[in-house]
């Protein structure tokens, strides 16, 4: 069963393999990261871990039984009890409820980071992401600037987190 794990240095190679294997798939929904991202991946990964240690973000990877990365789920711009959620899942597990289960779990974990509100933006043509957010309790909160989602028109979604959230049960995953 996949496990959501806090990002650490030891995940670097599996995350890079995940990003490379799914590059074309991700580019259908968001802007491509460009060759420079992959060429400088090690530096980027280290910088992300430094930001995480400083409390600016909280990054997680969904790890499969074979230790491969099935998805990335991140809380960015953490401040004043609010964070921006970003996520992506491997094409091979898309449409199987993996993203929904992980986003729900991350909503539970967000309280550990002192968060009360999560926001996420998705393009109008990314219906799957809209469904994930809706199933995880997010509601539309207004238009997203195309600069926030790779030049596409979209919507911001928001979820207010309740105190004492319980982790999702097996039937909710």
Describe the role of every protein-language-model region.
Residues 110-122:
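Conserved GNAT acetyl-CoA-binding A-motif
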Residues 86, 90, 121-123:
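Residue-level recognition of the GNAT/N-acetyltransferase active site
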Residues 88-89, 95-109, 127-135:
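Conserved acetyl-CoA-binding loop-helix of GNAT-fold acetyltransferases
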Residues 121, 139-158:
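Conserved catalytic-core motifs of GNAT/GCN5-like acyltransferases
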Residues 1-84, 92, 109, 150-173:
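GNAT-family acyltransferases
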């Amino acid at each position: 069963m996949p496990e959501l794990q806090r990002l650490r240095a030891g995940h670097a190679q599996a995350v890079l393999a995940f990003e490379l294997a799914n590059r074309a798939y991700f580019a259908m929904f968001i802007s491509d990261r460009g060759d420079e991202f992959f060429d400088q991946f090690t530096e980027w990964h280290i910088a992300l871990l430094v930001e995480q240690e400083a409390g600016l973000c909280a990054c997680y990877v969904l790890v499969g039984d074979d230790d491969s990365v099935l998805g990335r789920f991140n809380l960015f711009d953490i401040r004043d009890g609010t964070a921006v959620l970003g996520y992506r899942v491997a094409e091979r597990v898309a449409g199987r409820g993996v993203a929904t289960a992980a986003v729900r779990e991350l909503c539970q974990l967000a309280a550990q980071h002192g968060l009360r509100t999560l926001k996420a933006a998705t393009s109008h043509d990314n219906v799957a992401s809209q469904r994930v957010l809706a199933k995880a309790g997010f509601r539309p909160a207004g238009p997203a600037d195309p600069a926030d989602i790779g030049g596409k028109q979209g919507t911001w979604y928001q979820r207010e987190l309740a105190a004492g959230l319980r982790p999702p049960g097996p039937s909710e995953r």
